[in-house]
């Protein structure tokens, strides 16, 4: 906390002061609500709706509506909202992000603003990160809403359109972010209005909002179809990449060096920049590629596919690691989420990187997909009239939430004081020394019965630590992407006396570890982090597994100079501190200089990732502006608007365009390309072949000629229209054809735009 904040208070302090009087009003109504019968409490819902119709606002109703939900939750679930949960509910109603720690009951908090905003009858979406949570929360919290007379729906991945439509038409709908986004895209591909499933996007409450709007922000949702591209080039590039030698440069290559053409001594065939995750060919490497593919000039535009696929093949080998970035299961490459450690079925790296990894791992290389419709979560959630979110870790990304989504973060105090002790980091010179220290710490805690949760970043690290603990005779459980089926069982036991659990980031979110009998007296759950993540949020999530609802607990991170974060961001400075202190081998140091260095490195990476996400949004904004226009036009057609005048104008414009292509007022009529004009027009407008009249040959007036052809084209259209006894039948054909043409042209445009949009970033994409 800065000196300014100490003197004047934080942003959260100031905002909470404004909210406390509203909370007081809600609590003052407690005895009044308790005195109501069930029927009288239920009658409040139609009363509130009537008051809204008469001009009252949601803010006017808030204290009483929240008090009603509070009492209903007590009667139905035997759970009564604490004061801090009322604060969280008010912030959600205001379209903000309350940061509430693990175990503070965020799920119950959402019932307050969901009920209040559902009174408008326009739909409330409660967004979760997976089907399990959507179903659980709908069945659990939905009881409160149904008791009060509201309808509750849930949408699961397996649901058909009729079930989806019914769920979206409910007052409150529980749904995952992926299903929401894909339903939006599918709705903008339907041919008949009856096929639509969603209503307008009114109000969304996003659970784990930082996961959805920050971590997933770089992941475009894509509805795809198969492209006709061969996969042979990926295999050829992989063959060559295996034979190329990684080199080193004599100095770090900056953007300025590249622009100025600074000569840099280099060896090998390619260079790797681990910080920016980029690969570049050396002059020698370029020669190797030219010789292998028998091409004269690697940089020639005709060789763009070879250029691109060669870089992807090298990236697959130099920067993408099995059991860290992906796993191979059942002859398929599956992405591992860097933030959660979970396998992400159905997602593929974009830009050909996934195919390059498939070639590297010698599994079937799948064809690249063709984009039929796409949107990012950033642009999708910004379509809501109002949105809010909940999480235990949002403050570190406050600037991004405010700048991109227009939501501020307010830290909500805990219901009970936090008793967890967060120790300073311990730093070791080598990875081996660090792991030995971690194992010793686990053994000491285990000997006294204190449960331990060890958090690792990669699957490899979790398995290495598991082997070391096995050698020491320590019984333990491992939770990573390979053993995710046992997650619920493993997490349920992690707080029991003597339990030792090794987990990747999977255990960092959405899990509530309860302490077993007698564990509180032993110091509670002990959290050990085996290295710092690039994001401080992920570290905070791991810490947050301990110390829930006033429980005791402790956390500590163990680092080494071999860790990626330390190695890539100036470990020479840290080594200098280490050497100056003359630390014997195997001993740790705890030094504020190094702790500050680690935090600065994390902030630097977070800032860089924010810049990437912001850059993506700026790129996607071009697509988004165009998508808005296309989808709005599409909806006009779908809604049944009479398109006769629009199509009539299309015909007139087409005639004019083709005549301008083939005829000119500057040329004699005998030089007009009438044959070519017929070839262009007749396949589109089935009219008689065009011939110049004697008058047109003499006068050479192009405008009059245009007018005549336009009139003839109009007659063809009117004759076709007259063939239908019911004009509406013809209108329906027009609508269907027009929609199909719009879709075909839009998909072709997306094909053209894809290289512009995403080639500067290699992203996991969610494919359907």
Language-model segments: residues:
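Conserved P-loop NTPase motor core
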Residues: 1-561, 565-582, 632
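Generic hydrophobic alpha-helical segments
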Residues: 95, 181, 637, 753, ...
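Extended, charged helical/alpha-beta scaffold domains that provide interaction surfaces
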Residues: 326-334, 340-347, 549-550, 557, ...
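Single conserved hydrophobic/aromatic residue that forms the stacking wall/gate
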Residues: 760-768
């Amino acid at each position: 906390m800065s000196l300014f904040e100490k003197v004047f208070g934080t942003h959260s302090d100031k905002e909470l002061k404004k909210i406390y009087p509203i909370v007081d009003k809600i609590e003052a109504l407690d005895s009044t609500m308790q005195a109501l019968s069930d029927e009288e409490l239920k009658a409040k819902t139609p009363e509130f709706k009537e008051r809204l119709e008469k001009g009252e606002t949601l803010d006017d109703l808030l204290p009483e509506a929240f008090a009603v939900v509070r009492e209903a939750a007590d009667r139905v679930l035997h759970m009564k909202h604490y004061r801090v949960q009322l604060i969280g509910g008010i912030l959600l109603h205001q379209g903000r992000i309350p940061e509430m720690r693990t175990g503070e009951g965020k799920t119950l908090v959402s019932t307050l603003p969901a009920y209040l905003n559902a009174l408008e009858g326009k739909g409330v979406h409660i967004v979760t990160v997976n089907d399990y949570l959507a179903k659980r929360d709908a069945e659990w919290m939905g009881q409160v809403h149904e008791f009060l007379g509201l309808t509750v729906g849930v949408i699961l991945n397996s649901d058909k359109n009729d079930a989806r439509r019914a769920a979206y038409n409910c007052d409150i709908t529980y749904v995952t972010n992926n299903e929401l986004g894909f339903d939006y895209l599918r709705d903008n591909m339907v041919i008949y209005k009856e096929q639509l499933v969603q209503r307008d996007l009114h109000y969304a409450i996003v659970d784990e909002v930082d996961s959805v709007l920050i971590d997933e922000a770089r992941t475009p949702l894509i509805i795809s179809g198969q492209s006709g591209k061969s996969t042979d080039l990926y295999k050829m590039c992989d063959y060559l990449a295996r034979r190329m030698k990684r080199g080193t440069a004599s100095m770090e290559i900056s953007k300025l060096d590249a622009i100025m053409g600074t000569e840099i001594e280099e060896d090998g065939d390619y260079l790797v920049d681990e910080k920016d995750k980029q690969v570049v060919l050396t002059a020698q490497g370029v020669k190797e590629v030219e010789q292998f593919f028998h091409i004269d000039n690697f940089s020639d535009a005709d060789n763009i596919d070879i250029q691109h696929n060669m870089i992807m093949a090298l990236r697959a080998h130099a920067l993408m690691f099995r059991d860290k970035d992906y796993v191979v299961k059942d002859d398929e490459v599956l992405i591992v989420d860097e933030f959660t450690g979970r396998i992400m079925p159905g997602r593929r790296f974009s830009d050909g990187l996934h195919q390059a990894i498939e070639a590297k791992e010698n599994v079937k290389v799948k064809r690249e997909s063709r984009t039929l419709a796409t949107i990012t979560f950033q642009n999708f959630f910004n379509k809501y009239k109002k949105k809010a979110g909940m999480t235990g870790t949002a403050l570190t990304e406050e600037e991004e939430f405010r700048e991109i989504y227009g939501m501020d973060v307010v830290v909500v105090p805990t219901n009970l004081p936090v008793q967890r002790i967060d120790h300073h980091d311990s730093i070791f010179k080598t990875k081996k020394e660090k792991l030995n220290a971690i194992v010793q710490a686990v053994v000491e805690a285990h000997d006294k019965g204190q449960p331990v949760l060890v958090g690792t970043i990669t699957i490899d690290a979790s398995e290495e630590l598991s082997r070391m603990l096995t050698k020491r005779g320590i019984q333990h459980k491992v939770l990573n992407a390979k053993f995710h089926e046992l997650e619920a069982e493993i997490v349920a036991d992690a707080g029991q006396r003597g339990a030792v659990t090794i987990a990747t980031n999977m255990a960092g979110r959405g899990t509530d570890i309860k302490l077993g009998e007698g564990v509180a007296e032993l110091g509670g759950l002990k959290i050990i982090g085996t290295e710092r993540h690039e994001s401080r949020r992920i570290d905070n999530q791991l810490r947050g597994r301990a110390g829930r609802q006033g429980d005791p607990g402790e956390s500590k991170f163990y680092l080494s100079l071999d860790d990626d974060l330390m190695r890539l961001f100036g470990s020479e400075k840290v080594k200098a501190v280490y050497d100056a202190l003359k630390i014997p081998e195997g001993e740790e140091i705890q030094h504020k200089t190094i702790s500050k260095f680690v935090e600065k490195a994390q902030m630097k990476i977070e800032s860089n990732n924010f810049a990437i996400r912001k850059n993506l949004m700026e790129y996607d904004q071009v697509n988004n502006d165009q998508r808005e226009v296309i989808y709005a036009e599409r909806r006009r057609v779908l809604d049944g608007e009479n398109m006769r005048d629009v199509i009539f104008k299309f015909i007139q414009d087409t005639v004019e365009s083709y005549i301008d292509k083939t005829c000119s007022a500057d040329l004699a009529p005998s030089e007009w390309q009438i044959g070519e004009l017929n070839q262009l027009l007749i396949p589109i407008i089935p009219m008689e072949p065009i011939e110049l009249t004697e008058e047109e040959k003499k006068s050479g007036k192009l405008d009059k000629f245009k007018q005549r052809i336009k009139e003839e084209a109009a007659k063809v259209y009117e004759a076709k229209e007259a063939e239908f006894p019911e004009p509406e039948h013809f209108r329906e054909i027009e609508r269907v054809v027009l929609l199909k043409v719009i879709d075909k042209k839009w998909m072709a445009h997306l094909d053209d735009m894809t290289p512009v949009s995403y080639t500067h970033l290699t992203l996991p994409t969610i494919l359907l």
